[in-house]
Amino acid sequence: MTQRKIIDVSTYNDTIDWKKVKKYGCDGAIIKIIRKDLGKDKKFEENYKKCEKLGIPWGVYNYTYATTVAKAKSDMELVCDILDKISKKHFKYGVWFDIEDKVQAGLSKVKIAEIINAAQTVVESRGYKFGVYTGMSYFSEHIDKNKVKCKNWWIARYYKGYNRMAFKATPNKSYKPTNVADLMVWQYTSSGVFPAKVSTGNGGKFDLNILYHDFPATVQKEETTKKVKYTGKFPKLPPRGYYAFLDGITVLKNTREEIEKLQKFLNWAIGSKLETDGKYGEKTEDAVSIFQSKCKLKIDGKFGAKSLKAAKLFSK
């Protein structure tokens, strides 16, 4: 495909004249969707609606403050909930997980990988394409590519000494990140300007990016002509009503047999490839979370009455 030049925007850009943005040759935008307090970005509604009206391709990003897998999951569920309810005719650039905040800097590479992978699991299970945004130094210091599943990277690496850079200017390729094999987008400046001022915020400056590859915004699902239900046995819930990760240490035979049934069901339902060992460990908990996401249940990794009901109704 031809390389595309796109911008990313948020409330900091304030009111944007999207007609002018399109007129000056911008190929699309990635729009901030939620804030730290989990409310929508104050300009999200206005920005995406203008893109839809004018036929400007767009996607969304979430600047994450997550330091746990659970937080990453719940935040990305919210992102997908918002997207599910709005018009997406020109939604072409998917969902991006922006991880660069200092709150994650003290976490291990393993924990950061778990957070990213959890976010990806939620987004893709909801039918959207997923990518990760971060800065070049953050990528080098905090990301272990061998532990992160994502193959779509959006990396920021800026020129030094540029206070303003014209939208039409061609960036110096020597600054392009070279150690990211799966580079999808390069953010090359935070000081981009159009031929005339097109926004009332951030001094009229924008982040400018080059999109190198096609990035379908939604996951293509296979069409099936006949739904199939599970023919195996379902587990019986324990007295407290759910299975949870903390019970992975249990050795009671009857409990392990029930968890084996659950693992067999998850292998059938979502292809989780779990070892049917009867232990409710981290992998089983993650598989339950994926199943809950597919069924649009609360994601907590606990297999309880609502999850069991969904399992009995589940078909593929």
Functional labels for PLM-detected ranges:
Residues 234, 266-271, 291-297, 316:
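Short capping motifs at secondary-structure boundaries
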Residues 1-11, 19, 148-231:
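Functionally critical loop-and-helix segments that line ligand-binding/catalytic clefts
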Residues 288:
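Conserved hydrophobic/aromatic packing and binding residues within compact polymer-binding modules
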